[in-house]
Regions:
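Generic hydrophobic alpha-helical scaffold/packing signal
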Residues: 171, 219, 238, 251-255, ...
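Structured loop/turn residues at beta-strand edges in well-structured enzyme cores
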Residues: 72, 213-214, 257
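Alpha/beta catalytic cores of group-transfer enzymes, especially the acyltransferase/condensing modules
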Residues: 3-4, 29-31, 91-243
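Conserved functional loop/turn residues at catalytic and ligand-binding sites
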Residues: 81, 210, 258
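A short, acidic, amphipathic alpha-helical segment used as a generic capping/interface helix at domain edges
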Residues: 242-259
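Short, flexible loop segments at boundaries between secondary-structure elements
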Residues: 283-307
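FabD-like malonyl-/acyl-CoA
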Residues: 2-133, 137, 184, 261-291
Length: 308
């Protein structure tokens, strides 16, 4: 998801695997601008209309390297927010070209939905989900503006989104209730009702995009469920703009299926670190370097009994 981008991402891996830059070239041709240049120079990387296609392409480049090295296909795929698109590409539901065009548009619509400086997001730590929801409802009812739980990332870690004044009010209340509050450096309040106008326009683009049923089950952000038809894929991608990311439930679903190994295709290791906190996850691997890719590959092959 957004926030994991960094200037120069995948540069070292690109020197070792030609498929990395080839993937960026394929995606760049679809959107009409140079995604690899943005990733390496940082020019425009903080603008969501560029951030989103760059990150999606980086995730798919890592996925392709994983397969190139002989990595096994997972039982399930899931992606956090923007990452749901990467998961759908990996599952053959969306083409890479269509996906990068969609998320480029998604970024533009999200940015235009809320005037610059009006929206905000913050991470609330150390309070349970119900406490955070109650604080959001309290502030919203006092006419301080709209604020909602946007991302349920883990136990004791909820991200809120909404109007700036309301976000600041919830942050203050969280601290009064022995929680921590950290403002996030974003200009767009994702996954809240302020994004409904963007979602309505985005739904039209989704209707015109070829989408297949995923060949590998993709756990959706909204509801933490598996789509059983293409209409549900479209509906979930539309609703995802203004409804909460249910990552805690997603990871619980994975554990309930008996999954013990998790691999993260994207720059950084935020999701792998969240997975490591879960009792039934034996190992969680980030795949953003050759050594990490090889470590994950060997561990999973050993676990499956394919190598000793």
């Amino acid at each position: 998801g957004q926030g994991s981008q960094k200037v120069g991402m995948l540069a070292e891996l690109a020197e070792q695997f030609a498929s990395v830059e080839a993937t960026f070239a394929e995606a760049s041709k679809a959107v009409g601008f140079d995604l690899w240049h943005i990733a390496q120079s940082g020019e425009g990387l903080d603008q969501t209309e560029f951030t989103q296609p760059v990150l999606l392409t980086a995730s798919i480049a890592l996925w392709r390297v994983w397969l190139e090295l002989g990595g096994v296909a997972p039982k399930y795929l899931a992606g956090h927010s923007l990452g749901e698109y990467s998961a759908l590409v990996a599952a053959g539901s969306l083409s890479l070209g269509d996906a990068v065009k969609l998320v480029n548009l998604r970024g533009k619509l999200m940015q235009s939905a809320v005037p610059q400086g009006k929206g905000a997001m913050a991470a609330i730590l150390g309070l349970d989900d119900a406490q955070v929801v109650a604080l959001c409802q309290q502030v919203s009812s006092q006419a301080e503006g709209s604020v909602e739980a946007a991302n349920y990332n883990a136990q004791g870690q909820v991200v809120i989104a909404g109007e700036k004044a309301a976000i600041e009010a919830v942050m203050a209340l969280a601290k009064e209730n022995s929680g921590k509050a950290i403002a996030l450096p974003v200009s767009v309040p994702s996954h809240c009702s302020l994004m409904k106008p963007a979602a309505e326009q985005f739904a039209e683009a989704l209707e015109q995009t070829a989408i297949e049923l995923p060949s590998i089950p993709v756990i959706q952000n909204v509801g933490a469920e598996i789509a059983t038809d293409v209409a549900q894929v479209r509906q979930a991608l539309t609703a995802q703009l203004y409804e909460s990311v249910q990552w805690t439930k997603t990871m619980q679903f994975i554990q309930d299926q008996g999954i013990q190994y998790v691999a993260e295709c994207g720059p950084g290791n935020v999701l792998a670190n969240l997975a490591k906190r879960l009792p039934n996850i034996e190992k969680a691997f980030p795949l953003d370097s050759k050594s990490r890719l090889e470590d994950a590959l060997n561990a999973i092959l050993v676990a499956e009994g394919k190598i000793a």
